[in-house]
């Protein structure tokens, strides 16, 4: 299959360095302390944050001078064509751990001792890039909850398919067997918080793909800031009304 035509267009009409359309909204779960929906093309994730609140495991209360961050990732059974129960499969466990570690890097846990923060993520539609979409949704939900953070945690992926670097792979591209690099950054601090690669690449090629994913992260960070600023304006307008 030809994933990039002679005119330089991918199957969905994007250029190699174009992201899918991003749609995001906060405050979508009324009972949560913070929540968000984040869409990248046809991939859609909802995040809900509860906390900081008292540690539910009493044995850990005296041991923790930092907040405990817990994360649960799941996929809605209608999100893919796979009907098997996915909530407790190995991929969900692995992604829950990766997302938790990524969010711990941005949360100022030392300001909330003896407490816990719960992050729940559910993939409503899966079309590639679910890991990055979950991290971006979690960041929005944490900000919506007023959780203190040292920086935004943002993520994007890029791949290398048929000798071409591609930003923000969709499911068809991701399933084609090329390399996929997922990057998470703290943009203001200029730090990498996540780096995962599912295939070997020559160093020069890796650097190209990594740089492409990093640029995607910066664009997502800008979009997340816009969403949060717009939400702040709406809240101020309601208070003034």
UniProtKB/Swiss-Prot annotation:
Pfam families: RNase_PH (PF01138), RNase_PH_C (PF03725). GO terms for molecular function: RNA binding. Keywords: Acetylation, Cytoplasm, Exosome, Nucleus, RNA-binding, rRNA processing. Disruption phenotype: Aborted ovule development after the first mitosis. One of its GO terms (cellular component) is nucleolus. It is found in: Cytoplasm; Nucleus, Nucleolus; Nucleus. SUPFAM superfamilies: Ribonuclease PH domain 2-like (SSF55666), Ribosomal protein S5 domain 2-like (SSF54211). The keyword Nucleus applies. The modification N-acetylmethionine is found at residue 1. GO terms for biological process: rRNA processing. Non-catalytic component of the RNA exosome complex which has 3'->5' exoribonuclease activity and participates in a multitude of cellular RNA processing, maturation and degradation events. In vitro, is a processive phosphorolytic exonuclease and requires a single-stranded poly(A) tail on the substrate RNA for its activity. Can complement the growth defect of a yeast mutant lacking RRP41 exonuclease. Required for normal development of female gametophytes. Belongs to the RNase PH family. Component of the RNA exosome complex. Interacts with RPP4. This is Exosome complex component RRP41 homolog. The gene is RRP41.
